[in-house]
Amino acid sequence: MQNLTLLALDTSTEACSVALLYRGEKTHINELAQRTHTKRILPMIDEILANSGLGLNQVDALAFGRGPGSFTGVRVGAGIAQGLAFGADLPVIPISNLTAMAQAAFELHQAENVVAAIDARMNEVYFSQVVREKVRSDFGEFFQWREIISEQVCSPEQAINQLQNDNAFRVGTGWAAYSQFTEKNLTGSDIALPNALYMLELAQVEYLQKHTISALEIEPIYLRNEVTWKKLPGRE
């Protein structure tokens, strides 16, 4: 779909990124913006739309990194996505940050078996393993990622015990954060943080399958249970 226009944003980690698919071309802005996501993300969105001469109401759908990641970052991303989508009446596509890094591994390194570990602090990682598969449906043939280890928060030891093989491509900050991984020669790669650029392809597949939600259905995914999420005031 050459005419599909998608906007993606991610604030789930210390990286802050936005990306745009417009007329078949992808553009993106990516910054390290620890603790300044709330100040940077809206100007970045304004900039990327202005560079293409677009207004938010000309976007077909909004994708966002729904977690896991830092509590504050995931919450900011969900809140910004909800506000933008509600204001412009946009359908929303939540994207897993772990799967977005797997997509980066495919686009940059042709990896099709990817294990992700984001440092979750407290001697834990956000962890999953996915493989890229061709799928046939009423919407045609496309590729999607299938989980072989479900998204979870776990200790490095628990992650190691679940690994299907040592040959999967490794992404995320978790590998370098804990000695348990390095002792097993499980090192990371050049893909350490999620980037909205690699959410665009995932979002396009979801959009074509009509897998979208409304602004009011947005739910951040923390993978830890002690955090509550408040929707827009008066819309609980």
Swiss-Prot record:
InterPro entries: ATPase_NBD, Gcp-like_dom, T6A_TsaB
One of the protein's GO biological processes: tRNA threonylcarbamoyladenosine modification
Cellular compartment(s): Cytoplasm
Keyword Ribonucleoprotein attributed: no
Domain of life: Bacteria
Keywords: Cytoplasm, tRNA processing
Family according to the record: Belongs to the KAE1 / TsaD family. TsaB subfamily.
Protein's job: Required for the formation of a threonylcarbamoyl group on adenosine at position 37 (t(6)A37) in tRNAs that read codons beginning with adenine. Is involved in the transfer of the threonylcarbamoyl moiety of threonylcarbamoyl-AMP (TC-AMP) to the N6 group of A37, together with TsaD and TsaE; this reaction does not require ATP in vitro. TsaB seems to play an indirect role in the t(6)A biosynthesis pathway, possibly in regulating the core enzymatic function of TsaD.
Entry protein name: tRNA threonylcarbamoyladenosine biosynthesis protein TsaB
Taxonomic source organism: Haemophilus influenzae (strain ATCC 51907 / DSM 11121 / KW20 / Rd)
